[in-house]
Amino acid sequence: MRFRNVVLAAPTTVLLFFFALHASIKSQRPQQAPRPFREYPGVEYQSFPIPPDAGRQSEWVFARFMYRGIRYSNWTIDYPRSDRHFAEAVRRLTRVDARSVEQPVAAEDGDDIYNWPWLYGVEVGHWDLTDLEAAKLRDYLLRGGFFMCDDFHGTWEWEIFTASMKRVFPERPIVDIPDNDPIFHAVYDLDDRYQVPGAQYLYTGRTYERDGYEARWRGIYDDKGRLMVAICHNMDLGDSWEHADEPEYPEKYSALGFRIGVNYLVYAMTH
C-alpha cells in the first residue's frame, strides 16, 4: 500500500478543484447560507465534548446525511465520535483544513444540501427515503456532489438499500468499482484492500456480519465516468474511525479505514 504525496506537496490544486466543485453544486440554485453547526442526540452518544475550535472557519466539513430509519435513528450510529476522529485524520494526513466538528444535513432542509459537496451515510441498510429526499439527492449528485455509503451488511440490508437507491437513480446501475479506478489511487494506492469490521469483531472474532462474508466496493457513475456514489458494503469504516483510539481495536483496520476515507474525500474534491 503506497502513499502518493500529491496532497501534501500540492494542496493548492486540490483546493481549487474543491472550490470549483462547491460553486458547481450551488450554481443555479436559490442562495441559502449554510446551516450553523448543530448537535443531535445519537443512538450511542447522548453528549460528546465539543472541540474548542469548533466555530473556526474551515475548507472542508464532514457532512453526515440524515434520513428516516425503518427502526430508529440509524443515521446517528457512531455519531459524532466517528466524524470527529475522521476530521482529525484528514488534518493530519493531508493539508485539507477540516473543521473539527461534523454537520448533519437533511435533504428536505431547503437547499442546504448543496452547501456540502461530500456526504457520508451510515447504516443505509435501514433507510427509507421519501420521494422528495430521493429527488433532492439525485439532483445534488448530478450537480457534482459525492455520497459515501457505509456500514451495512448482508443480503437483507442490501435489498433495503437498493430499494431507496433505485428511487434516486432508477436507471443507473450499481457496479463493482475496478481496482484501477482513480478513487483507489487518489492519495494512497489501495491495491491491498480487505474487510474492515465493526466493533463486534472484538467479541465475535469475525470480520463479517450476517451473511456479508465478503467486502464489496461498489458505486454509481455519472455519464462522464465520475463516481457519484461510493458504496462500502459488508464493512464498517465508521467503526474503524470511531474506535481508532482504543487499543483493543486492531490498528490495521483503523489504518485502512482512514486511508479509504481520505482517498474518497480527495477523489470527490478533485472530480
Question: What residue ranges belong to the model's regions?
Answer:
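N-terminal secretory signal peptides that target proteins for export/translocation
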Residues: M1-R4
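Core RNA-modification/binding signature centered on pseudouridine synthases
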Residues: V7-L8, Q28
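Bacterial N-terminal signal peptides
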Residues: A9-H22
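Residues embedded in well-ordered secondary-structure elements
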Residues: L16-F19, P51, G219, Y253
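Aromatic-Pro/Gly-enriched surface loop or interdomain linker
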Residues: K26-W118, V122-G125, M228, D236-D239, ...
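An acidic, glycine-rich "communication" segment
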Residues: Q32-G42, Q46, I70, E157-G238, ...
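Helical hinge/lid and interdomain linker segments adjacent to catalytic or ligand-binding clefts
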Residues: T76-T162, R167, V196-G205, C232
